[in-house]
C-alpha cells in the first residue's frame, strides 16, 4: 500500500498526486469545451424556408439539451478549477461531493442526449404508423446541425462517465466505509 492509500484509510484525507489532478482537470476542460461546442451549434441552429421557420427553441428536447450543456460546461470549469486549487490532502467530504455532482451531471447530460437523439431520429425518419413524415426532407441543414450537437453531447456524456469512474474509484477504494 502506498503513502496515498495509507493517508486515506488512516484518516479522513486523501493526497492527490499531480498526475491525477492534471488528468482529471484535462478531462473536465475537454468536457467543458465539447459542451460549449454542442451548445453553440444548437443555439445557432435555425432555418427559415417556404414551410416556415424552425429553431432549437421550438423543441423542448433541444431546449433541455442547451440547458444541460450549459450546466455541464459551468460545472466542468468550476470543478476543474476546484480540482487544481484543492489543498492536498482533500477531505472525504470533498471527494464525496465531487462524486455526487459528477453522477448528477453525467445523468443530466445523458438524459439530454437521449431525448434529443429521439427527436432527431423522429425528424429524420418520422413515424409512419401515426403518419408523421420526415421533417429533414424540408429542414435538412437543421437536422444535420442538431445531429452534430447530439453527438457532441454524447461524447461529453462518455467523458463524464469516465470522470464518474475516477471519482467513484477515489471514493470507494481509498476511504473506509461510512
From Swiss-Prot:
Main localization, broad class: membrane
Instruction: Please give one Pfam family short name.
Output: CASP_dom
Q: Where in the cell is it found?
A: Cell membrane
Q: Which segments cross the bilayer?
A: 23-43, 70-90, 97-117, 146-166
Which residues point to the Extracellular side?
A: 44-69, 118-145
Side of membrane Cytoplasmic, spans: 1-22, 91-96, 167-178
GO biological processes: floral organ abscission
Membrane topology label: Multi-pass membrane protein
Q: Keywords, A to Z? A: Cell membrane, Membrane, Transmembrane, Transmembrane helix
Query: Cellular component terms, GO, for this chain's entry?
Result: plasma membrane
NCBIfam families, sorted: A_tha_TIGR01569
| Subunit note | Homodimer and heterodimers.
Q: Which family does the UniProt entry place this protein in? A: Belongs to the Casparian strip membrane proteins (CASP) family.
Q: What is this protein called?
A: CASP-like protein 2A2
Please report the organism this UniProt entry assigns to the protein: Arabidopsis lyrata subsp. lyrata
Organism taxonomic ancestry: Eukaryota, Viridiplantae, Streptophyta, Embryophyta, Tracheophyta
Amino acid at each position: 500500500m502506498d503513502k496515498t492509500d495509507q493517508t486515506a484509510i488512516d484518516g479522513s484525507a486523501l493526497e492527490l498526486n499531480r498526475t491525477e489532478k492534471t488528468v482529471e482537470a484535462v478531462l473536465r476542460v475537454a468536457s467543458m469545451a465539447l459542451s460549449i461546442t454542442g451548445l453553440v451549434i444548437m443555439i445557432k441552429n435555425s432555418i427559415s424556408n417556404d414551410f416556415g421557420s424552425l429553431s432549437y427553441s421550438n423543441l423542448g428536447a433541444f431546449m433541455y439539451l442547451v440547458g444541460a450543456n450549459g450546466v455541464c460546461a459551468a460545472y466542468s470549469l468550476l470543478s476543474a478549477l476546484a480540482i487544481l486549487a484543492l489543498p492536498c490532502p482533500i477531505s472525504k467530504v470533498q471527494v464525496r461531493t465531487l462524486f455526487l455532482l459528477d453522477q448528477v451531471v453525467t445523468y443530466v447530460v445523458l438524459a439530454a442526449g437521449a431525448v434529443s437523439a429521439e427527436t432527431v431520429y423522429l425528424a429524420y425518419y418520422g413515424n409512419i404508423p401515426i403518419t408523421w413524415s420526415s421533417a429533414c426532407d424540408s429542414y435538412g441543414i437543421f437536422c444535420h446541425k442538431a445531429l452534430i450537437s447530439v453527438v457532441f453531447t454524447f461524447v461529453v456524456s462518455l467523458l463524464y462517465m469516465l470522470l464518474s469512474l475516477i471519482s467513484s474509484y477515489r471514493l470507494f477504494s481509498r476511504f473506509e466505509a461510512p
